[in-house]
Regions:
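Hydrophobic alpha-helical core bundles mediating ligand binding, dimerization, or RNAP-core interactions
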Residues: 38-42, 146-147, 165, 180, ...
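Helix-loop "lid/cap" segments that line or gate small-molecule binding pockets
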Residues: 112-113, 164-168, 182-188
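Conserved hydrophobic packing residues within short motifs/helices of P-loop NTPase cores
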Residues: 1-4, 53
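A general secondary-structure junction signal
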Residues: 6-8, 162-165
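Glycine- (often His-adjacent) and acidic-residue-rich active-site loop
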Residues: 6-44, 60, 172
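Short C-terminal tail/terminal secondary-structure segment
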Residues: 205-211
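Crotonase-fold acyl-CoA enzyme core
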Residues: 43-156, 189-190, 194-198, 204
Length: 211
């Protein structure tokens, strides 16, 4: 289980350093390493086999919005805001587009990108950018509740399920179905699946091994 959050209560992730990027230097690609660090970060979060939860304790701007979209779940404090203000300084959130496109409806996404106006917590919940909104005092309690609920489930089922969901995102529906059919026997043959079946039949709590 991985919970991503910011230090303190002001920001989850404030985005890039505008002063440091004033000359455009940070945005120049290294010919020997053309992948942008933000893109690698989002991909790593999405591909992570452990469940990821964004604990949004304050403003999440630019890359912060991308991190939230790359996570599996998100819990947001009601005072927080999520935005992509790059257009206000003559930029566009190029590397943030891919993870956000997978979560937000296109029209709301474009509104955020071309106006630079951030979403309130209420709006983020409405558009499924986050799972839950709480007051600041209840943020840790809600995150802990989710962590406990996930921790009670089979680690191997979650691990294989996350792999499947991530792999199927760019497939056609028939491809998704064929891929799912190949994975179903694999998950059913794990130690956790056998333990889960036996625990259900004998009416006891399963003891997961994660294998």
């Amino acid at each position: 289980m991985i919970v991503l959050t910011g230090e303190g209560e002001r920001a989850f992730c404030a985005g890039g350093d505008i002063k440091a990027g004033a000359d455009g230097g940070p945005f120049v690609q290294d010919p020997a390493d053309p992948d942008h660090f933000a893109g690698r970060l989002f991909e790593a979060i999405q591909a992570c086999r452990k469940p990821t939860i964004a604990r949004i304790n304050g403003v999440a701007m630019g890359a912060g919005a991308g991190i939230i979209c790359a996570c599996d779940l998100a819990v947001m404090a009601d005072h927080a805001r999520i935005g992509t203000p790059e257009v206000k300084v003559g930029l566009f959130p190029m590397t943030i587009v891919p993870p956000m496109m997978r979560v937000l409806p296109r029209r709301k996404l474009m509104e955020m990108f071309i106006t630079g106006v951030p979403l309130t917590a209420e709006e983020a919940l409405k558009f499924d950018l986050v799972n839950y909104v709480t007051d600041a005092a209840g943020l840790d309690e809600k995150v802990a509740e989710l962590v406990a609920q996930i921790a009670a489930q089979s680690p191997s089922a979650i691990r294989l399920g996350k792999y499947a969901c991530h792999a199927m995102e760019d497939m056609t529906y028939p491809q998704q179905m064929r891929f799912a059919e190949t994975l179903l026997p694999r998950v059913a043959q794990t130690e956790d699946a056998r333990e889960g079946f036996d625990a259900f039949i004998t009416k006891r709590k399963p003891e997961w091994t994660g294998r």
